[in-house]
From Swiss-Prot:
Family: Belongs to the metallo-dependent hydrolases superfamily. Urease alpha subunit family.
Stretches that traverse the bilayer: none
Coiled-coil parts of chain: none
Superkingdom in the source lineage: Bacteria
Gene responsible for this protein: ureC1
InterPro entries, per database record: Amidohydro-rel, Metal-dep_hydrolase_composite, Metal_Hydrolase, Urease_alpha_N_dom, Urease_alpha_subunit, Urease_AS, Urease_asu, Urease_asu_c
Modified residues (N6-carboxylysine): 224
Keyword rRNA processing: no
Name the UniProt record assigns to this protein: Urease subunit alpha 1
Alphabetical list of PANTHER family matching this protein: UREASE
Source species: Streptomyces coelicolor (strain ATCC BAA-471 / A3(2) / M145)
Length: 573
């Protein structure tokens, strides 16, 4: 029987089991662990679309109708990178959800076709052969300041935005809070036509539990406590009381100035309850200089914001100006300048790199337009992974490729933020039953520029050439909105995540909007152990005088890098 070389097979059908794929211009490689769509011993029946190819009537395409269960769309032969593994498979989508991961085709002519991946005449095909698929990104730290941030997020592969704001008001420029029923109602309406899932954080900086309960009924999915509104131990404890009774999450930006207490006082106020610790390194805010010690506690779900990722020769300098703008400070006021300088510490930024690689910091987010870049969550995650690969070599368990590291880092912006906010039953991974929020990448552009962004089964964003050209590819090829981002389509492909109390109180009926309101699942009792691939609890200590950081007794030596992948090679500006 004639055989194909691995090179020829990869050219025709994409890489298969045992092949390695380089991720863009990084030093990271992934090795395919399993090929569910074909590969060695199963070649010959791969689902491939095109002239003279397999997916034609009575060949790879059968007669199964949509009413009989055929999927609406099949992504063929894609390399899935997810927290659970690195596998190649066909992916079926039906009614906006993932229905099958395996082998697609026509069981009348092919062996091993997954029963939920039977291709019929009503099935669309997306060619994933030679491409990578990841789950849509989830950003849990979004300031809703400029509407254009939604486009930037989508163009980068982020499909779920959680945070707060009402536009460029001072409160929103500094804090991720949408305060009160009136603001929440019109912000839900404003984002109705945006093809992203939305979740708003309410103001937890209050001793009024009744106000917090009102905000829950008005549609918040959780609360945010921020030092600019007040982050005292009493406020934290009161808000967590409401979180415990309602099941929602509390995200905290703690007291940088240590005015109302030190980091230990905040930990005492939390009292072992689950908490989502924002920008835990501290440059984005939080007890100076030792907020980073929160990574040692099992009840803390720690996150980074992306401007400190990874530590480069430019990181410290750019942060001072960012701080002045974001927190309404005046560089001519000595106290304001001291406030800013206390937050920017090379030692803790350097430690943040290592803690990510150890799996001790579980989540990556943006802090969009408030000391963070919404379009760089994914990019900076993989830049950090690259820097750590160069510095620390393979992770234990990795030898020929970086599968464990890839699974660890992809989890930071997909499944782990979903778990932290109680939405992992709907989004956060490439698994059956979940919303088909999927990102298709050319491996050469992985982490930088998605080829397609699929939102609830609909193509919402894509790299697309001149619309007046004779084919889709002539320059300028740019990330552009597609039909899934137009008209009323976003109301069918995206959801609003809210508290269960909001749904029970009739919020969807009161607002009368088109998209579904989906209640979160309880976040209470969740711990670091629930953070996929990122559950490490090292002992971290920070010297009060020098800010020197030790991790499990080992001193961290700052080594800012001068060059990164996924940078000027991919972007003019």
């Amino acid at each position: 029987m004639p055989e194909l070389s691995r090179t020829a097979y990869a050219d025709l059908f994409g890489p298969t089991t045992g092949d390695r794929v380089r991720l863009a211009d990084t030093d990271l490689f992934v090795e395919i662990e399993e090929d569910r769509s074909g590969g060695p011993g199963r070649s010959g029946d791969e689902a491939v679309f095109g002239g003279g190819k397999v997916l034609r009537e009575s060949m790879g395409q059968g007669r199964t109708t949509r009413a009989q269960g055929a999927p609406d769309t099949v992504i063929t032969g894609a390399l899935i990178i997810d927290h659970w593994g690195i596998v190649k498979a066909d992916i079926g989508i039906r009614d906006g959800r993932i229905t099958g991961i395996g082998k697609a085709g026509n069981p009348d002519t092919m062996d091993g076709v997954h029963p939920d991946l039977v291709i019929g005449p009503e099935t669309e095909i997306v060619a994933g052969n030679g491409k990578i698929v990841t789950a849509g990104g989830i950003d849990t730290h979004v300031h809703f300041i400029a509407p254009g941030a939604v486009d930037e997020a989508l163009a980068s592969g982020v499909t779920t935005l959680i945070g707060g704001g009402t536009g460029p008001a001072e409160g929103s420029k500094a804090t991720t809070v949408t305060p009160g029923a009136w603001h929440l109602a019109w912000m839900f309406a404003a984002l109705e036509s945006s093809p992203v899932n939305i979740g708003f954080l309410g103001k937890g900086s209050t001793m009024s539990k009744e106000s917090m309960r009102d905000q829950l009924r008005a549609g918040v999915l959780g609360f945010k406590i921020h030092e600019d509104w007040g982050a005292t131990p009493a406020v934290i404890s009161a808000c967590l009381d409401v979180c415990e009774e309602s099941g929602v999450q509390l995200a905290v930006h703690s007291d940088t100035l240590n005015e109302a207490g030190f980091v230990g006082d905040t930990f005492d106020a939390v009292a072992g309850r689950t908490l989502h610790a924002f920008h835990v390194e501290g440059a984005g805010g939080g007890h100076a200089p030792d907020m980073i010690t929160a990574v040692s506690l099992p009840n803390m779900l720690p996150a980074s914001t992306n401007p400190t990722r990874p530590h480069t020769v430019n990181t410290v300098e750019e942060h001072l100006d960012m701080l002045m703008v974001c927190h309404h400070l005046n560089p001519a006021v000595p106290e304001d300048l001291a406030f800013a300088e206390s937050r920017i510490r090379p030692s803790t930024i350097a430690a943040e790199d290592i803690l990510h690689d150890m799996g001790a910091i579980s989540i990556m987010s943006s802090d969009a337009q408030a000391m963070g870049r919404i379009g760089e969550v994914i990019l900076r995650t993989w830049q950090t992974a690259h820097v750590m690969k160069r510095r620390r070599g393979f992770l234990p368990g990795d030898t020929r490729a970086d599968n464990l590291r890839a699974r660890r880092y992809v989890a930071k912006y997909t499944i782990n933020p979903a778990v932290a906010q109680g939405i992992e039953h709907e989004v956060g991974s490439v698994e059956t039953g979940k919303l088909a929020d999927l990102v298709l990448w050319d491996p050469r552009f992985f982490g930088a520029k998605p080829q397609l962004v699929i939102k609830g089964g609909q193509i919402a964003y894509a790299q697309m050439g001149d619309a007046n050209a004779s084919i889709p590819t002539p320059q300028p090829v740019l990330p552009r909105p597609m039909y899934g981002a137009l008209g009323t389509a976003p109301a069918t492909n995206s959801v609003n995540f809210v508290s269960e109390q909001a749904v029970e109180d009739g919020l969807p009926e009161r607002l009368g909007l088109g998209r579904a309101f989906v209640p979160i699942r309880s976040t209470r009792g969740r711990t670091k152990a629930d953070m996929r691939q990122n559950d490490a609890l090292p002992r971290v200590e920070v010297a009060a005088d020098s800010f020197a950081v030790t991790i499990d007794g080992e001193l961290v030596e700052p080594a800012p890098v001068t060059e990164l992948p996924l940078a000027q090679r991919y972007f003019l500006f």
